[in-house]
Regions:
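Short polar/charged helix/loop
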Residues: 2-206
């Protein structure tokens, strides 16, 4: 786990509306949902498909104000072979990806869980979002691998400083498969719950 970077954000501007529900709920096997939290959370992986969306789903059910993002140039999903991924633009909706893969090979993408994942995703928000295009303020940014952490920190450091609002960036290494994404999402949720009952993020030590 990598942590402790203190970056800065621009004021809120030109941000897409939150697609996920902020309604409190109970995830499978989870404890009772906590009240809505003022902590503004972002979860970031490479393609905004598996790890960040699983965490987005669980955190939103627990009442957190959460958004999820990818940092890649394009969205990549597994294809029929390791060297033949399905590549999409970030403007492509989850529903469009779902229908494209359904047409290409329903059996393959049902068996490997990609269609199920996309079906979940489109219930949370319309399309993947790229972190570098978002100018919203966050108290806590959680990344799902070290490379993504580095990309987030690099982007934050490249932005013009307009406020003194600190943001805490923590990396939680999560393997990019469905099982590890679920386990990682509960770990991220536990971490957010700990931070939300600690002193305000703006006053935490770097």
């Amino acid at each position: 786990m990598t942590s402790g970077h203190r970056g800065r954000h621009l004021p809120r501007a030109e941000a897409a509306p939150l697609g996920g529900s902020s309604e409190a709920g109970v995830a499978d096997g989870a404890a009772t949902a906590m009240p809505s939290s003022p902590l503004r959370v972002a979860v970031v992986c490479s393609s905004n498909q598996n790890r960040s969306m699983e965490a987005h789903n669980i955190l939103s059910k627990r009442g957190f104000s959460v958004r999820s993002f990818g940092t890649g140039t394009h969205v990549k999903l597994p294809g029929p072979a390791p060297d033949k991924p399905n590549v999409y633009d970030f403007r492509t909706t989850y529903d469009q990806m779902y229908n494209d893969l359904l047409r290409k090979d329903k059996e393959l993408y049902t068996q490997n869980g990609i269609l199920h994942m996309l079906d979940r995703n489109k219930r949370i928000k319309p399309r993947p979002e790229r972190f570098q295009n978002c100018k919203d303020l966050f108290d806590l940014i959680l990344t799902c691998e070290e490379r993504v952490y580095d990309q987030v920190v690099e982007d934050l450091n490249s932005r013009e400083q307009e406020t003194c609002q600190p943001v805490h960036v923590i990396n939680v290494d999560i393997q990019d498969n469905h099982e590890e994404a679920t386990l990682g999402a509960f770990l991220i949720c536990e971490l957010c719950q700990c931070v939300s009952i600690s002193p305000a993020p703006a006053t935490l030590s770097p």
